[in-house]
Amino acid sequence: MRKARITARWRGAGAVVAAAALSLGVAAGCGSSDSSSGGSGSGGSVDVVGYSTPETVYTDSLQPAFNKTPQGKGVSFSDSFGASGDQSRAVEAGQPASLVHFSQAGDMSRLVDAGMVAPNWDKQKYKGIAEDSVAVLVVRKGNPDGIRSFDDLVNKDVSVITPNPFSSGSARWNIMAIYGSQLHEGKSPQQALDAVKTVLGKTQVQPGSGRDALAAFTQGEGDVLISYENEAIKAQSEGESVDYVIPPSTILIQTPIAVTKDAPKAAQDFLDYIWSDAGQKIWAENGYRPVNPKLVDLKKFPTPKDLFTIDEFGGWDKVNDEFFDETKGKVAAIEKELGVSTAG
């Protein structure tokens, strides 16, 4: 029988302060994803800290399925899900974590720099990526505004919902999707940045996380939500009156995952399960694109006409410094001009 699971949510600055008060010195790092997971489960507990959107995939699907395997027998989970940047900062401050899953690599780099995650986390299986998605445009049923691309967000009189990029990793993906799509149309970097500014200027609210942004949209805020494809699929599966559009030019979203230094064997076993065919099929069932290309159903997950990656802009370390640094980033300057908080 599966042990009781403790679910905790740590969000915002208060979460970091609370985490710092803990006397638990959590070491964090990345064990080899190719290590054997044979034999019977050793029990124990896995502390999962993740970004907001895959919470129910973990609690309702991945963890129960893992518990049914020989390696997962007797393993219990303590879970914390929230805005990716907030979660990463909380772990750095002392929140217990043996497996971390963030929405963008910059949040993992923070823990590498803190000595909590091994530097070679991205040299593991599937380059340390748990699952894929793409940035999409979620609209009201029937798409009354005729939204087809990121250009429409720039040119049409619509209200946009996207999270705050200084707490949410998904917001950073959204912004780079807009920026990259403009470059791919032949616009200059300044014109692409102007497009980002125009879209952000149409946001009446910037929630703290991708999941909070979806909630705001389904509760009636805004005309268009920029979101992960899996969030749109989730909303439809739950009966929400929405449609979604995959823009012809959009970004491939890749979310990093790693076990922490000195994490228990159960954490590595769970990560191995996440990367297994069984685990990847669970991601697919929940609207995420498997990282194993052999498991991608192209009818459910069509390939966008023009799909680009964050590497095109130099990777997340460069992007975070150029665009999202709180003091000198290009997007920080835009948000400050709009009166939006850039405090991490």
Where are the regions a protein language model picked out?
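Ligand-binding pocket segment of bilobal, Venus flytrap-like solute-binding proteins
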Residues: E185-T250, P256
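A bilobed periplasmic-binding-protein/Venus flytrap-type ligand-binding module shared by bacterial periplasmic
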Residues: A135-N143, L252-A267, I282-N286, V291
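Short beta-strand->loop
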Residues: N120-A130, F150-D151, Q236-I251, V259
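Extracellular/periplasmic juxtamembrane helices and adjacent flexible linkers that interface
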Residues: R2-I6, G12-A15, P264-G344
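Bacterial signal peptide processing site
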Residues: G31-D34
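Ligand-binding cleft/hinge of the Venus flytrap
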Residues: P64-Q71, V154-G208
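N-terminal segment of the mature folded domain
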Residues: G38-S167, D306-T309
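C-terminal motif of bacterial Sec signal peptides marking the signal peptidase cleavage site
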Residues: L24-G29
